[in-house]
Amino acid sequence: KEIASVSFPMSLSSIFGALNRNIDSMTVVRGLKNFMSEEAAKIQYGILSGKVETLVTIPMSFNMAFATALVPAMSKATAKGDIKTVEKRIKFSILVSILIGLPCMVGMILYAKQILLLLFPNAASGEFIYQISCLGIIFILIEQTVGAALHGIGKVFIPAIALAIGGIIKLILNLSLVPINNEIFLLGGTAGAALSSVICHAVVLTIELLVLKKQLKLKFEKRKFIIKPLIAVLTMAI
């Protein structure tokens, strides 16, 4: 029973995560066909799913080690009732995610064209889509860590619920934005699909973070978690 109570919600999270990733495959080509040929629509979708999304997920591999290690450490501290250790480990892991995510996000946005030309020369036209997608990196990485923390403290259904809500919002935005010609509206077409993914991850993170803060009464120092990382990243960018 204990194994099932943990594995079932984790499976739900994986299912909803997979469904969210497949929303584009179900809606993008169909929406793009409103203002371009099917062949051109498939090419645009290929740039979004095959090139852009591949590059955006690279920073996740660096952050995954911290998120994975957090679950058993959190479970052990929670079982002992050591709330201070729980809070300390969560805050440290979130800070690490920020310090990984922000430089990756800014660097990829600034050098989007060069990265695409180097790795995928045929997809250089996807620069703007890539830049929009990169905005979601910081949300994805912190979402990984916060989701792991929620599993660690026993709130295993929250990530699945958050992903379901985020997926619904992404589907609505895809159906609304993708059919719009991006020559008429800059954030239409595949740019709309990229933006909907960013908003989806932002919504998921917001829900998870609100629950985590409510459960543990976490307080994040603005100077440490926002101001200093932003100053460092802006200095790097300049």
Question: How would you label these PLM feature ranges?
Answer:
Residues 14, 224-238:
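Transmembrane alpha-helical segments of multi-pass transport proteins
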Residues 60-80, 84-87:
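Helix-loop junctions and terminal segments of transmembrane helices
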Residues 9, 16, 41-63, 95-96:
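Alpha-helical transmembrane segments of polytopic membrane transporters and translocases
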Residues 3-4, 49, 82-99, 103-111, ...:
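Interfacial transmembrane-helix starts/ends
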Residues 1, 157, 167-205, 238:
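Membrane-interface helix-loop junctions in multi-pass transport and translocation proteins
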Residues 146-155, 208-226:
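Alpha-helical transmembrane segments
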